[in-house]
Curated annotation (Swiss-Prot):
Belongs to the MurCDEF family. Gene3D superfamilies: Mur ligase, C-terminal domain, Mur-like, catalytic domain, NAD(P)-binding Rossmann-like Domain. It holds the Pfam family MurD-like_N. It comes from the Bacteria. It comes from Pseudomonas fluorescens (strain Pf0-1). This is UDP-N-acetylmuramoylalanine--D-glutamate ligase. Signal peptide: none annotated. ATP binds at G116, S117, N118, A119, K120, S121, T122. Cell wall formation. Catalyzes the addition of glutamate to the nucleotide precursor UDP-N-acetylmuramoyl-L-alanine (UMA). Its EC number is 6.3.2.9. GO terms for biological process: cell division; cell wall organization; peptidoglycan biosynthetic process; regulation of cell shape. Keywords: ATP-binding, Cell cycle, Cell division, Cell shape, Cell wall biogenesis/degradation, Cytoplasm, Ligase, Nucleotide-binding, Peptidoglycan synthesis.
Length: 448
């Protein structure tokens, strides 16, 4: 039985991927609804008109009077809740909600809920693979891959969900079995008033959670609320009670739980300290929902990482080339620079720049000075990054990604790595971060 009242009228606001999943969910349950989108030709309009021709749809500027016909608006995550028409509707008593809230009301299996500024997709995918290795019927999605509502099934034994701050803004009570915010650093400052507002949005993931997983190296990940729920921690330090971390024995580093060594770090296919942290976070989440260590370790030993996330491309003349195009904020770039920088004998030659989304870049200076041989700058906010780094290392300008890769090859020495980790969004020069990553890979593969 669907936990949704059928006597109310709803409007889906936003007709992208998640909006279309809402349309399917509501239509399949016979719920009365309409659709609105600020764009004249939203991405899923043709699909809506083909499959649901009787659903009313309004495209273009949002009409407050139209929105106020609804008892509830399901707002897609791409649309800011501060949009004046949405605020006007809310002021007149219309409830603002979203697909994750609706998913949580209807999910019958436990939910592993994962957010954070960085590493969400890697950890979400890894926990999903751990659950599959343990023989669980697992569904993985949310902000990653399949929209949440399309995952709902009576056959699912465990949901593993990546959730963005935008999705969490419209989620009142997730009621996850275990929830985590992996890390917090500035991101989406073009949408939030500052880090505190972004932090509060992320922490909505903990509402109703039965267990927490906390990064003990990032105080901002600790829940702001709690009533004695079990709390597991992860970090790169030595673990103690209810903690996952790193232990060293006879010169060998191990992933460990409490006082038990689980596996040598060298057996991980994913490189860098940041990926060791990701592995520990996944172990903590899996342990919280009862996944056996033997199955989780099988998944860890075979997991090779995700495309565009510190993805190894090739080695050439003693230099490794890595595609980290998904690093669309400073925190993600720092994780890659520090993680790879500490894992190699040489230095990092970094490609950075793009649309900075209003972020500050000053935190790049010291890690760049420590780990980088040179920085190749490109894109809209390259000057801002250059000002933040200053004279810490040589700065080289490039106008295209092909030019940037050529400059990297000239600057790199054997033992170095070339790293595309832009610390910026891609839309100033590319269709999306995937397009940027694919162009980088092609440029690297074309090197003779």
């Amino acid at each position: 039985m669907s936990l949704i009242a059928s006597d109310h009228f709803r409007i889906v606001v936003g007709l992208g991927k998640s909006g279309m999943s809402l349309v399917r969910f509501l239509a399949n349950r016979g719920v009365a609804f309409a659709v609105a989108d600020t764009r004249e030709n939203p991405p899923e309009l043709a699909t809506l008109q083909r499959d649901y021709p009787h659903v009313e749809v309004r495209c273009g500027e949002l009409d407050v009077e139209f929105l106020c016909r609804a008892d509830e608006l399901y707002v897609s995550p791409g649309l800011a809740l501060a949009t004046p028409a949405l605020q006007a509707a809310a002021a007149r008593g219309v409830k603002l909600s979203g697909d994750i809230e609706l998913f949580a009301r209807n999910a019958k299996a436990p939910i592993v809920a994962i957010s954070g500024s960085n590493a969400k997709s890697t950890v979400t995918t890894l926990v999903g693979e751990m659950a599959a290795a343990a023989g669980k019927r697992v569904a993985v999605g949310g902000n990653l891959g399949t929209p949440a509502l399309d995952l709902l099934s009576d056959d699912v034994e465990l949901y593993v969900m990546e959730l963005s701050s935008f999705q969490l803004e419209t989620t009142d009570q997730l009621n996850a079995e275990v929830a985590t915010v992996l890390n917090i650093s500035e991101d989406h400052m073009d949408r939030y008033s500052g880090l505190p507002a972004y932090h509060l949005a992320k922490h909505r993931i903990f509402r109703g959670a039965k267990q927490f997983v906390v990064n003990r190296q990032d105080a901002l990940t600790r829940p702001l609320m709690g009533e004695g729920q079990p709390c597991w921690t992860f970090g790169l330090s030595k673990p103690d009670f209810k903690a996952f971390g790193l232990r060293e024995e006879n010169g060998e580093k191990y992933l460990a739980f409490e006082f038990q060594n689980l596996m040598p770090v060298r057996e991980l296919k994913i490189r860098g300290a940041h990926n060791q942290s990701n592995a520990l976070a996944a172990l903590a989440l899996g342990h919280a929902v009862g996944l056996p260590f033997d199955a989780m370790l099988v998944a860890l030993r075979t997991f090779a990482g995700l495309e565009h996330r510190c993805q190894w491309v090739r080695d050439l003349d003693g230099v490794g080339y890595y595609n980290d195009s998904k690093a669309t904020n400073v925190g993600a770039a720092l994780a890659a620079i520090e993680g790879l920088g500490a894992d190699i004998d040489g230095k990092v030659v970094l490609i950075a720049g793009g649309d900075g989304k209003g972020a500050e870049f000053k935190d790049l200076r010291d890690p760049v000075a420590t780990h980088c041989r040179a920085v190749i700058l490109m894109g809209r906010d390259s000057d801002k990054i250059g000002e933040a780094i200053g004279d810490a290392v040589p700065l080289i300008r490039a106008t295209t990604l092909v030019d940037a890769v050529a400059q990297c090859r000239a600057a790199a020495q054997p033992g170095d790595v070339v790293l595309l980790s832009p610390a910026c969004a891609s839309f100033d020069m590319f269709n999306n971060y995937e397009d940027r990553g694919h162009q980088f890979v092609r440029a690297v593969e074309d090197l003779a």
